[in-house]
């Protein structure tokens, strides 16, 4: 049958890797693992999706990825270049695995995949990513800790800049679904002036 055939292929004498689809959400990988394959030669890869709104939803992505992660199999997903001009399909909506990633900067896509703890390898689905994108991708992938890109207001003060960028922020344990709270700066800089300015209603994404 198909599963025993895949098992035999993982035990090839040449070290050839056998890559199977991660995105379907079936028990295919469980059936293969029941035959005790050589897991050094068995890899999983998510699909990429060229049409807008056809990419994986996050919950399904996690569900599918965990099926492979529980066996400690190497996993891969695709991110989308915004400088690329072509892919395997005529449409040019990008070529990512997660639909949520389609319009995000490539570094943000990579950071998200890394933070899931579910993906080992990340590839660019469309061609060709720019040198700047590849550099940003590599920096995000190899970063010692996660970072958030912050676009500052022109009126930012020097004390605010120091509080934002000269610290390793830690996320409070009593976490919220709506905000990331880093509170030690109010201890470190309690004697610095932080006058109110650029006041307006806070919207999603504000710091």
Which residue stretches match the model-derived regions?
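Short, small-residue-biased leader/transition segments that mark boundaries at the very start
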Residues: 2-4
